[in-house]
Structures are given as structure tokens and as C-alpha cells.
Design a protein with these regions (language model features):
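Positively charged n-region of N-terminal signal peptides that target proteins for export
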Residues: 1-4, 18-19
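Sec-dependent N-terminal signal peptides
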Residues: 4-12
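C-terminal motif of bacterial Sec signal peptides marking the signal peptidase cleavage site
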Residues: 14-16
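Buried hydrophobic residues that stabilize the cores of well-folded domains
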Residues: 19-312
Length: 312
């Protein structure tokens, strides 16, 4: 499901941070994958994801997992429903399955998503991922994200159900986007629960040329490098507005990611670097048809983690 979500959301068009542009409403022929086969060299597992595209709309995806070439379990199906050219609902899995989920989108008069709700009717608070997320805009830019999800917290030596409430305020300064996220724990009436903590975290993103090139989060810095070819996913405007903060994620940048370096200082004061590198093979249009992902953690040996074969 995660692989589908990444590919699905990556079709958001990158036309400027937080800007809305509805010149295109469909999927460009030959620019969105019809099939992705992922294999993991360090295991005997693989995953095949196929996409059902009709009349320029992505209607569904089917994710099938294999072990030693034999299918394991039931294929996972995700369906999208539309009102005109806008996605209004996504359904994950079978209604009777434990991991079944429904996601709904609400739009304002300008066609921007202002509310996103995900419900997992068969999951419990402890292992579920139900939430409500609201988006606020000013001057054509995304300026605030409000998210609330059920969780549990230890209060006076007892585990109690509460709502985790976060407000992320986005401030734009040149190529930097500073996000201050304040988290509180609230009851069903929206009041802050006594005995819980409130904290604020700051993350600074640097975006240049349509690419996220740096993220600073606390003591951790992540830097990104890209090739010079156009990432085909962002060419598709179909799902443009369903992820208003797409520009804060490297997977949705204008060009194709080829390196990610995560740096931090460990408890001994030593600088540690974890490196993810990607080798790409392209078709005649310059779109990736194969991705080989390597990882090197600190001083460990660089190893091949995953191979993706992409068919358009």
C-alpha cells in the first residue's frame, strides 16, 4: 500500500510551492507508470503494482506481494472516486479486512483541499492510522496544517485515550520554508488534557528549482541531489491538490532523486552520515525505467536494497 501511495501522490504537479494551477487535469500518456515491479536482493520477496488508468484518470491500483515467486496473501486493491476531475474518496483494501481504510477530501471554492479525513473502521487506537487534517491558505500559499488523530498517553500512571493535536505553521523566506509544529493532547471537547506535555518542533526546508535540496530538523540535516532529467510523476496534474504540502517531500521534486545524505552527531560527539544513492536507467523520453537503491549506514559497506522496474 505504501508503494502505491508514494507513486499516486507523486503525480502532484510541481509548479511552485503551495501554488494552485489547474491548466491540466489528467494523466499524461506515457508519463505515469502502468506497472512497477520491486525486488529486494537481500530477501526472496518482491512486489508488483499495476495501475488502472482510464480517460486520463487513475481509477485503481493492485498491489501483489510474492515470496520465492509465489503470491503471498490476497492482492491489495486501492480505488479512487471522483467528482468531475477531483478525487473525493479513496478506499484501501476490502471492506471486511482489518486494514480497510477510507480517505475523504473536501475542497473550497477555488478547488483547493481544505480537509482530509482517514478512517480505519476495524482498527484500534493503538495500531490504527485514522486522522483528520485541515489545510489553511493565505495569498495562494499553504500557511497552516492542523492534524488530529486518536492515540493513548500515560497520564498519572494510567494509559488513557486522548487526541493528538498538531498545528504546523509555514513561513516562507526566500528559498526557505520554516515549519513550526506545536503538539498538544486534547480531550473530546478540544480542551488540553491536564498532565500531558506540549512541545514545538521546527523544521527548515530549502527548495530550489522545484527540488527540495535540504531539510534541517533539530540536530539532523538531510541533503538531496537530483539528476537533470524531468521526474515523470509530477507531469500529471490529476492529483495536484490532494497533497497541498507536496513540495516538502523529496519524492515529489521536479527532477529525479539520485542521492540523499542524512547527517547527525551521535552521543559520542561523532558525525554520522547515512547515504542513500539511486542509479537510474532511462527510456527515450528520459524517464526512469529502472531504479537501483543503495544504502550505506555510517562506516558500513554500501549495499543494494531494492530494484524497481517501471513500465509506462
Amino acid at each position: 500500500m505504501k508503494k502505491f501511495f508514494i507513486a499516486l501522490m507523486a503525480s502532484v504537479a510541481l509548479v511552485g510551492c503551495g501554488k494552485d494551477d489547474n491548466n491540466d487535469t489528467g494523466i499524461q500518456e506515457g508519463a505515469f507508470p502502468k506497472k512497477i515491479t520491486s525486488t529486494y536482493p537481500n530477501s526472496n520477496r518482491s512486489t508488483v503494482t499495476t495501475y488502472n488508468i482510464q480517460n486520463g484518470k487513475l481509477l485503481s491500483a493492485t498491489i501483489t506481494e510474492y515470496e520465492n515467486g509465489v503470491q503471498t496473501g490476497t492482492a491489495h486493491i486501492i480505488k479512487a472516486e471522483y467528482l468531475g476531475d477531483r478525487i473525493t474518496q479513496m478506499k484501501y483494501g476490502q471492506p471486511s479486512a482489518e486494514n480497510y481504510a477510507i480517505k475523504d477530501y473536501t475542497y473550497d471554492g477555488q478547488g483547493r483541499v481544505i480537509k482530509e479525513t482517514r478512517v480505519e473502521p476495524h482498527r484500534t487506537t493503538e495500531n490504527g492510522d485514522s486522522y483528520t487534517q485541515e489545510y489553511r491558505y493565505e495569498g495562494g500559499q499553504l500557511t497552516k496544517i492542523i492534524r488530529q488523530n486518536p492515540t493513548t498517553n500515560w497520564i498519572n500512571g494510567e494509559r488513557k485515550k486522548v487526541n493528538r493535536h498538531s498545528e504546523s505553521v509555514l513561513a516562507y523566506s526566500g528559498s526557505d520554508i520554516i515549519v513550526n509544529e506545536t503538539v498538544t493532547y486534547r480531550d473530546g471537547n478540544g480542551a488540553v488534557v491536564t498532565g500531558t506535555s506540549t512541545y514545538t518542533e521546527t523544521t527548515t526546508y530549502t527548495v530550489a528549482g522545484g527540488n527540495l535540496i535540504k531539510k534541517i530538523e533539530g540536530e539532523r540535516t538531510t541533503e538531496y541531489k537530483y539528476d537533470s532529467n524531468i521526474n515523470p510523476m509530477p507531469l500529471n496534474a490529476l492529483l495536484r491538490t490532494t497533497m497541498p504540502d507536496y513540495f516538502l517531500n523529496e519524492d515529489y521534486s521536479k527532477n529525479n532523486l539520485i542521492e540523499e545524505v542524512d547527517s547527525y552527531t551521535d552521543y559520542q560527539g561523532k558525525l554520522v552520515k547515512n547515504i542513500k544513492s539511486i542509479e537510474l536507467t532511462y527510456n527515450s523520453k528520459g524517464y526512469p525505467t529502472m531504479k537501483k537503491t543503495f544504502r550505506q549506514r555510517g562506516s558500513e559497506t554500501k549495499t543494494l536494497q531494492m530494484i524497481e522496474e517501471i513500465e509506462y
